[in-house]
Amino acid sequence: MAVGWFYLSVLALCSLGSMCILFTIYWMRYWHGGFAWDGSMLMFNWHPVLMVTGMVVLYSAASLVYRLPQSWVGPRLPWKSGHAAMHLLAFLLTVLGLHAVFEFHNHAKIPHLYSLHSWLGITTVFLFACQWFLGFSVFLLPWASMWLRSLLKPIHVFFGASILSLAIASVVSGINEKLFFSLKNGTKTYSNLPSEAVFANCAGMLVVVFGLLVLYILLASSWKRPEPGMQAEREPTRTRGRAGTPEVMLEGERGLAEPLLQKRS
């Protein structure tokens, strides 16, 4: 049952994440003319798409790598490398998104970093950069001791969830700000809820629901990878491998691995 709920949640996340990206693309194409890379308003339209894709969807996918049951066994290095690579890709898309909005502001002679949305966003990106550097240097490179990693892991996990929360707040405030700037004239003010406002509000709600589901999976203790030190505290259950060799499975892993064992038998 546990593994079923986990993969059902992953399927829901994939659907919600895709919808968040597609809704943002459609909003920028249908109501704001599409995309370009020339310093115009069409270049700005890349900003929400890249930020939602990088800071929310890809960032969340990278954060959930260690929740996959397949990552609980075998060497950790491939999973660590995948985790770091996905976060790096998310960061690169985020930097492109920032470049798009800064270039548009330069072209249109608009001041930088004056709104609450921009303060939230730049703080989130700064924390993301620090988080990635800390994770790469301490948890991926081999120099750090187990004591140091154990000390920094709770901090790394806390800021991982905090950065996602800040990213969601930045996206929601950015959607709100964009609508206030776009819907100015008397025929389609934001308060009258024209079709663009309804659509963009729905896109924002999708981002919020997506983020809450990601945070739930990250915080659910039954879906976390068991710590190596917990093996001695849990009663091991012996099963038979495919070739008849004994395998040791922790009690906390049995629920997620049960379907695999049934297939083997």
Swiss-Prot record:
Q: Which residues lie on this side of the membrane: Cytoplasmic?
A: 1-2, 67-83, 141-154, 219-265
> How this protein is processed and modified after translation, per its record?
N-glycosylated.
The record's annotation in InterPro entries points to:
CYB561/CYBRD1-like, Cyt_b561/ferric_Rdtase_TM
Annotated residues that bind L-ascorbate are located at: 76, 80, 149
Transmembrane regions: 3-23, 46-66, 84-104, 120-140, 155-175, 198-218
* The EC number(s) this enzyme carries: 7.2.1.3
Show the GO cellular component annotation of the record. Answer: late endosome membrane; lysosomal membrane
Glycosylated where? 185
Assigned keywords, A-Z = Electron transport, Endosome, Glycoprotein, Heme, Iron, Lysosome, Membrane, Metal-binding, Oxidoreductase, Translocase, Transmembrane, Transmembrane helix, Transport
Q: Which SMART domains match?
A: B561 (SM00665)
Show the Pfam families listed in the entry.
Cytochrom_B561 (PF03188)
Q: Which reaction does it catalyse?
A: Fe(3+)(out) + L-ascorbate(in) = monodehydro-L-ascorbate radical(in) + Fe(2+)(out) + H(+)
How this chain assembles, per its entry, is: Homodimer.
- What phylogenetic lineage does the species belong to? Eukaryota, Metazoa, Chordata, Craniata, Vertebrata
- List required co-factors: heme b
Cofactor, how bound (note)? Binds 2 heme b groups non-covalently.
The protein's name in its UniProt record = Lysosomal membrane ascorbate-dependent ferrireductase CYB561A3
**Per the database record, which ranges form the Cytochrome b561 domain?**
12-219
Which residues of this UniProt protein bind heme b 2? Answer: 67, 83, 156, 224
Bilayer disposition of the protein:
Multi-pass membrane protein
